[in-house]
Amino acid sequence: SINDFTVPKLFELGMAAKAENRLSSCVVYAWAMNRFLRPAPYLQYIDEQKYIKFIKTSFSEMNSKFQFPFNIGDIKIIGFQIETTDNEGLIPIVLYLTEFDLNDPELDKKARQAKDKILKKFHGLDHDFEYLLMRAYNEMPSDPKKKYNVHGTVIKLKD
């Protein structure tokens, strides 16, 4: 579990997000469900098939709605990921390409300025999560064997 969120609780949150048209949040919960669905090889939730169907449907809807890459203003969005932390729980991550030097302090400013446009496209994230991470790359991270330079900007979603 993550921050005491079990798979049944994540399913409940995901269904609520889906019912309120917050697909991006729904996918975050589905991702977490997928990660924790089988806590051990011999353990299985009674409703596992229902959870698997929800996970697959959520991912499929996300993939059909968001044809990566796409532009939001002058930011080229290349992907969407999720990470977990012990303190903050689930953190949605928007991956994007930039021509700026990854050490340029303006990068954080530009990412924060794009917050409203990002949240409009990824509707619901500000309703369900405390933070959003914007992860910038100078080139498409397409080779799994290659190490890429990256710059992250944490955006607080709730005051």
Regions found by a protein language model. Give the residues of each.
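Short beta-strand edge/turn micro-motifs at domain boundaries
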Residues: 1-4, 120-149, 159
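Surface-exposed, polar helix/loop patches in the mature regions of secreted/periplasmic/lumenal proteins
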Residues: 1-5, 79-87
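Alpha-helical protein-protein interaction scaffolds
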Residues: 3-62
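Hydrophobic beta-strand segments of well-ordered beta-sheets in folded domains
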Residues: 27, 91-96, 128-134
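Alpha-helical linker/edge segments of TPR/alpha-solenoid repeat scaffolds
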Residues: 51-81
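Short glycine-rich, basic-tinged beta-strand/loop micro-motifs
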Residues: 86-105
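Extended alpha-helical scaffolding regions
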Residues: 98-101, 109-132
